[in-house]
């Protein structure tokens, strides 16, 4: 089976390694990824994508693509004569590309479809407080994340698990799912099921606007919002006119839920930092003030020593 693998971030690397090590009968003829770019900062030297780096370590051929809609890219894919195209955290492909695979093209998506279709499924699942997540493989079609499902793998989600931690776990669960999907296709046993549109939900791209904390929410919702965006891009708020990223929080059941303090109020108790929601408090554990490095709460507190209700997060 001639396999064309497409992916970019660290999430896709375990799947690439699994496919490359699939054994006799499976050949990765090319790895397609994005071009080298500055990744540490705008002025840093260009670096390869995690997928490119892994592919080179595995001795695989790499094709860097800027524009997947370029007809020349579709021609290159067709010339490779792939039996299957495997896509993991890449881009939206045109029909001329995904239609070039003899046995079909499938995508690895980090949710239990049809839930959380879109660019940020892991983040949105955690932000909603879901206690179960997983991955889905499905055949590509023109509408994004709507294709026929090949298989799913589910996993429970910890109450304090953040997006970075869950993404790492799902990357390895996804690698097993990709390999199982390839074997099903190779053996002609890839039975598919339609997605139930009545159960569909969206996971839109994360922006500056939709990652800002609204303190007029319950303490549980605030904790879920923060862990759903940790460590990147991170939930943020403002303090004294400056932006503050909050990377880690925890439930604070020991704090009295009844309080005259408004949502967003800060409280310091024995060097620990708490923020008020509509029905109680959460503890803030790791923060980063604009222009500063990330700090654990005790160090952060020493930097400004607020009173009980001042300053306030907004």
Curated annotation (Swiss-Prot):
GO terms for cellular component: cytosol
Superkingdom of source: Bacteria
Keywords: Protein biosynthesis, Transferase
Enzyme Commission identifier(s): 2.1.2.9
Keyword set includes Transferase: yes
Broadest EC class assigned to this enzyme: transferase
A family per Pfam: Formyl_trans_C
GO molecular function annotation: methionyl-tRNA formyltransferase activity
Binding site for (6S)-5,6,7,8-tetrahydrofolate: 111-114
Catalysed reaction, written as an equation: L-methionyl-tRNA(fMet) + (6R)-10-formyltetrahydrofolate = N-formyl-L-methionyl-tRNA(fMet) + (6S)-5,6,7,8-tetrahydrofolate + H(+)
Family: Belongs to the Fmt family.
Role, per record: Attaches a formyl group to the free amino group of methionyl-tRNA(fMet). The formyl group appears to play a dual role in the initiator identity of N-formylmethionyl-tRNA by promoting its recognition by IF2 and preventing the misappropriation of this tRNA by the elongation apparatus.
Name of the molecule in the record: Methionyl-tRNA formyltransferase
Gene label: fmt
């Amino acid at each position: 089976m001639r396999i064309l693998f497409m992916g970019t971030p660290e999430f896709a690397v375990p799947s690439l390694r699994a496919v490359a090590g699939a054994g006799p009968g499976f050949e990765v003829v090319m790895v397609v990824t994005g071009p080298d770019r500055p990744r540490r900062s705008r002025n840093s030297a260009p670096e390869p994508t995690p997928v490119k780096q892994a592919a080179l370590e595995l001795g695989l051929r790499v094709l860097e693509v800027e524009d997947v809609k370029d007809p020349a890219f579709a021609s290159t894919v067709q010339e490779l004569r792939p039996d299957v195209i495997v896509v993991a955290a890449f881009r939206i492909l045109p029909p001329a590309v995904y239609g070039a695979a003899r046995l079909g093209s499938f995508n690895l998506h980090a949710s239990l479809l049809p839930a959380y279709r879109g660019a940020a499924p892991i983040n949105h699942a955690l932000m909603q407080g879901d206690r179960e997540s997983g991955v889905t493989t499905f055949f590509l079609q023109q509408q994004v994340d709507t294709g026929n499902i090949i298989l799913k793998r589910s996993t429970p989600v910890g109450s304090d698990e953040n997006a970075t931690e869950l993404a790492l776990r799902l990357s390895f669960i996804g690698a097993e799912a990709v390999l199982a999907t390839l074997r099903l296709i190779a053996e002609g046993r890839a039975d598919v099921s339609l997605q139930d549109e009545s159960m569909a939900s969206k996971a839109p791209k994360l922006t500056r606007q939709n990652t800002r904390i609204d303190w007029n929410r319950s303490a549980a919702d605030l904790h879920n919002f923060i862990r759903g965006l940790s460590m990147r891009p991170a939930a943020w708020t403002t303090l004294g006119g400056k932006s503050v990223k909050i990377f880690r929080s925890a439930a604070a059941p020991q704090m009295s839920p009844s309080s005259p303090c408004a949502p967003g109020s800060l409280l310091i108790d024995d060097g620990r930092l708490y923020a008020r929601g509509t029905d109680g408090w959460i503890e803030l554990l790791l923060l980063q003030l604009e222009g500063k490095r990330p700090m654990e709460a005790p160090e952060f507190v020493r930097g400004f020593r607020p009173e009980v209700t001042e300053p306030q997060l907004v």
